[in-house]
């Protein structure tokens, strides 16, 4: 809590550390998802400062999300904008354009085999997780997720399963790590995509498995 309000005091006016579209989207997602914890025991002035900062970040993202680099940074920016638009009073008009932009990014960045241009399995997992959050937030708000988002999740899930070793960790290619423990299982369960085997190569990678031994 102290770190959050220190950041608001130092950088909450839209300048300084953290004011890029991807980081702002990431911050909005975390602040909103952990709002009950962050606001616990705060006084009225602190609570108002928190919501003012959230609103300022939404306005910033509305203008600046197109400047985020294509791929994970842009998905972070748009997912944060959608989450904030759904959660904050008076921000509903921003949801539709953000959802449409997210659908366009899904169609452009996620190929027919469920891969992304960087071919980084851990980055693929991060994008997949953001899309599951966006889909869940829209569904819980009574909105129908765009078909492009749903289809992207359906393409990505088999690819992620194919890129996972028997110990649960992702193959480490193109700068990616094994992924946070339990993140892949949680994201797959949340997406609700029926388990299927990836047809052919998974993002250009082949998988062999026997018992507890895997080769990717």
Model-derived segments and spans:
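Carbohydrate-active enzyme catalytic cores, enriched for enzymes
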Residues: 111-216
């Amino acid at each position: 809590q102290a770190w959050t309000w220190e950041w608001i005091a130092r950088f909450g006016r839209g300048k300084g550390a953290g004011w890029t579209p991807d980081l702002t989207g990431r911050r909005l997602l975390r602040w909103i998802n952990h709002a009950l914890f962050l606001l616990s025991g705060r006084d009225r002035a602190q609570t108002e400062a928190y919501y003012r900062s959230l609103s300022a970040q939404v306005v910033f993202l509305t203008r600046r999300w197109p400047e985020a680099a294509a791929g994970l940074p842009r998905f972070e920016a748009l997912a944060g904008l959608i989450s904030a638009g759904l959660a904050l009073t008076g921000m509903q008009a921003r949801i539709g354009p953000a959802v449409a932009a997210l659908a366009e990014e899904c169609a452009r960045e996620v190929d027919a085999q469920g891969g992304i241009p960087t071919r980084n399995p851990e980055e693929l997992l991060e994008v997949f997780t953001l899309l599951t959050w966006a889909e869940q937030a829209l569904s819980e708000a009574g909105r129908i997720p765009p078909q492009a988002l749903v289809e992207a999740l359906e393409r990505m899930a088999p690819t992620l399963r194919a890129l996972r070793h028997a110990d649960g960790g992702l193959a480490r290619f193109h700068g990616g790590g094994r992924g946070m423990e339990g993140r892949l299982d949680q994201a797959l369960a949340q997406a609700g995509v029926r388990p299927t085997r990836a047809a052919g190569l998974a993002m250009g990678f082949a998988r062999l498995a026997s018992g507890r031994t895997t080769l990717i």
